[in-house]
Amino acid sequence: MSRYTGPRHKLARRLGISLDGTGKDIKRNFPPGQHGHNNRRKLSEYGIQLQEKQKLRHMFGLNEKQFRRTFDNASKMAGVVGENFMKLLESRLDNLVYRMGFAPTRPAARQLVNHGHFLVNGKKVNIPSYRVQPGDVISIREKSRGLQLIKDALEGRTFLPNYVTFNDAAAEGTFTRLPDREEMPAEINEVLIVEFYSR
């Protein structure tokens, strides 16, 4: 299954969740379409699990193959599978570029990483799925510091998670530790996703 490339605001309304973290994509809290107000069908148990999976998958902008591979990796780790899964997603380079405020949205962060604008511990990394380790430092390449998209995003940043620190003078952030569950998206019930893949 390929990555969704259609209108994200329509997808957000269909899933009932903000995909970009701003809430602007879900101002109208009902599904798109002529009968959106009356189109909230009662979902089966499978439908509820599937919808939860789709929420998280589209939130991070992954295709099914990438998403499932991350879940399988989480299943092999010690601890709670659902929380491990969320932590692996939060540890992605594109997500941390977004969390640190280098980009206004995850899709924008993914594109910036793809174009080679960031360094991890001083080395260029252009793989959005790169797994950042606690203690790793993410910075902007010298020749990319003048990019207006990055400058505007940093100036507009209003929140910084507790599991990252940011040096404004150096324009670099450090992933200090893996996030606790309460620091990850509260609108996601990862237990339903574990149940979906355990069917």
Swiss-Prot record:
GO terms for molecular function: rRNA binding; structural constituent of ribosome. Keywords: Ribonucleoprotein, Ribosomal protein, RNA-binding, rRNA-binding. Pfam families: Ribosomal_S4, S4. InterPro entries: Ribosomal_uS4, Ribosomal_uS4_bac-type, Ribosomal_uS4_CS, Ribosomal_uS4_N, S4_RNA-bd, S4_RNA-bd_sf. Disulfide bonds: none annotated. Residues 91-154 form the S4 RNA-binding domain. CDD domains: S4. The keyword Ribonucleoprotein applies. GO terms for cellular component: small ribosomal subunit. One of its GO terms (biological process) is ribosomal small subunit biogenesis. Belongs to the universal ribosomal protein uS4 family. One of the primary rRNA binding proteins, it binds directly to 16S rRNA where it nucleates assembly of the body of the 30S subunit. With S5 and S12 plays an important role in translational accuracy. Part of the 30S ribosomal subunit. Contacts protein S5. The interaction surface between S4 and S5 is involved in control of translational fidelity. This is Small ribosomal subunit protein uS4. It comes from Brevibacillus brevis (strain 47 / JCM 6285 / NBRC 100599). The gene is rpsD.
